[in-house]
Amino acid sequence: GDDEPAGAGAATADVRIKVSAAASLKTAMEGYGARFTDARVAFSFAGSDEHAAQIRQGVRPDVYAAANTNLPEELHGEGLLEEPVEFATNTLVVAVPAEDATVRTFVDLGDDGVKLAIGSRTVPVGSYTRTVLGRLPAATRRAIEGNVRSEEPNVSGVVGKLTQGAVDAGFVYASDVHATGDALRIIDIPDDLEPTVTYGAAVVNDAPNPEQARAFLAGLVGTDGQAALRGAGLGPKP
């Protein structure tokens, strides 16, 4: 914790914990990991669903952090995780290239010729996107769905398509736009369509280093973790 004398982490720094985290957490987790003194941290960033599949297949990281609460709850129910905690929030947005004005408002997404990238159905960002589309009038939804040119395995893939100029717009998190500096611009999703985006994490059952894993999780919901999340453009724990 914060009250440890300087250098207290050095004794345990030979312990290395593995953290499997959602792609949208890269900036935040690396920032927090640098402040965490109880162990060295090795991160793996991918779609939350991809990490969940690996854990179900027997891969044992110390900590699993997802961009939703469903997956941690499911894995907990299957006896694969300890009790999950909610540690961050985010906002789903439409991102467009900062220099490109093809899409100016949310309703433009259904215009002829607009090219869209979204997350695949199984990844949280794709699931949240489909929640938004499902709240639209049928004709509007069909027009937008008809403009989807790419379904990506994680949010980093959507950001990549945008920064490469391969698409005109994409559904990502506000923190992803924050992470690109000035490359992308946010178009807000109307409030009545906006889903609640909450991140859940848990210590993995049979984790190699459960003590340090629990300390990592405690710090994530504590001052250091919340500061790193805020600095990366995510919202606080609910």
Residue spans for each PLM region:
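Exported/periplasmic ABC-transporter solute-binding proteins
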Residues: D2-A34, D49, A53-R56, A66-T69, ...
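Short acidic/histidine-rich motifs immediately flanking catalytic phosphotransfer sites
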Residues: V59-P61
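A short beta-strand-loop structural module common to alpha/beta enzyme folds
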Residues: R40-D49
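Central helical "cap/lid" subdomain
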Residues: G79, E83-V85
